[in-house]
Amino acid sequence: MRALVQRVSRASVSVGGELIAAIGPGVLVLLGVAPGDTAGVADRLADRVRALRIFEDGDGRMNEALGARQALCVSQFTLYADTSRGNRPGFSGSAPAEAAEPLYERFCERLGAERGAFGARMAVELVNDGPVTILVDAQSA
């Protein structure tokens, strides 16, 4: 499981022109699920994302975790793209939707995140703050 975590001042997700989720200051998490990922992996990664100290404290140093700030999570199987052969990426490194969706939902629930629409074509808008963008792999969580 991989989480691309972006510190944002705001973010939103729309499907078919309809707004389905929006947050103010917090994190936008693009989440990819791999074959073999488990509920335990989802829980550990969500806890790790929540604990990342990527917000500024009173002294302007990145020293605070998510806390009461908001989170928005979007499923992103393309985080497991394989570009080693030619110019067309392969996605066999990502879990099939029927295995990935319950783990995505579990991760979002544990993180307390608003959600995009799993498997849908979405328009994601964000204002990156910093910018701060961090890739967290479950193997290191």
Predicted segment positions?
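Glycine/small-residue-rich phosphate/adenosyl-binding loop
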Residues: F77
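Compositionally biased, non-globular sequence tracts
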Residues: A22, L135-A141
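Compact, glycine-rich, soluble single-domain proteins
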Residues: L19-A68, A81-E109, E114
